[in-house]
Amino acid sequence: MAAAPWYIRQRDTDLLGKFKFIQNQEDGRLREATNGTVNSRWSLGVSIEPRNDARNRYVNIMPYERNRVHLKTLSGNDYINASYVKVNVPGQSIEPGYYIATQGPTRKTWDQFWQMCYHNCPLDNIVIVMVTPLVEYNREKCYQYWPRGGVDDTVRIASKWESPGGANDMTQFPSDLKIEFVNVHKVKDYYTVTDIKLTPTDPLVGPVKTVHHFYFDLWKDMNKPEEVVPIMELCAHSHSLNSRGNPIIVHCSAGVGRTGTFIALDHLMHDTLDFKNITERSRHSDRATEEYTRDLIEQIVLQLRSQRMKMVQTKDQFLFIYHAAKYLNSLSVNQ
């Protein structure tokens, strides 16, 4: 059995120093983004235009202009608070991980969220991973945007015409979109999977697509690394249903904290040499004989932060990734 990767043996005090470095880097980017620097890589672009206020759940979480998701529209505003994210660590990533990180839909934006899912995922079998409860501490964290199969909750229609911000904020999509409940099942006590059909009301727009909606609302205690076990199962399950070529859509409330933490863990466990060996004992094991000299988790978080602000937002979330990775390694050792 190979030794545990060196970077999961670091002291918390050292890890907090790394988190501070990551945060300081981002502070510099945001200063540049807001000081009028021409052609800044960190420009927030149209996200801060007043007409988009109603499209942002929070006033301080915006996508960078260069990798924001553009809605597929026939006319009008193409803005949604969502970012394309690619994770690819040289020397470790078996293949790149592709995601859309986005805020939890609101009562004004749930229609455009579904239009994004349909048009920005080119293939059938779309996966959405939701890592927030609808309500937390008596505060709405996400609007219940999907049909759950109850009485009068099997079909919804996302309109082709939307104006979340009023008359000056119009968007025209190619078609209305029918969102239809198919079935639901709970996986152990871990998460709930709802299968949904997306059907354009104009058949010329495109085919029916299937969405697999993973609702993981129990992730509350970042001090318990064993909570990575259901996440590990969720990662494997969601990848098995997602069509290769589609990004996995991940959201919490703001689309940065738990979203970033999930994406970091997902790529770590599913697509890196060090941890693919632990979680699957895969055929790639002979490729990881040399110890990786960089801190793999830090490299992943740095990549996430360079593509969407505040990804892995808190110190507890940052530490959780390391503690969870260490816990996974201990499971492998004890097998």
Swiss-Prot record:
InterPro entries: Prot-tyrosine_phosphatase-like, Protein-Tyr_Phosphatase, Ptp1, PTP_cat, Tyr_Pase_AS, Tyr_Pase_cat, Tyr_Pase_dom. It comes from the Eukaryota. It holds the Pfam family Y_phosphatase. Its EC number is 3.1.3.48. Present with 2690 molecules/cell in log phase SD medium. Belongs to the protein-tyrosine phosphatase family. Non-receptor class subfamily. This is Tyrosine-protein phosphatase 1. The gene is PTP1.
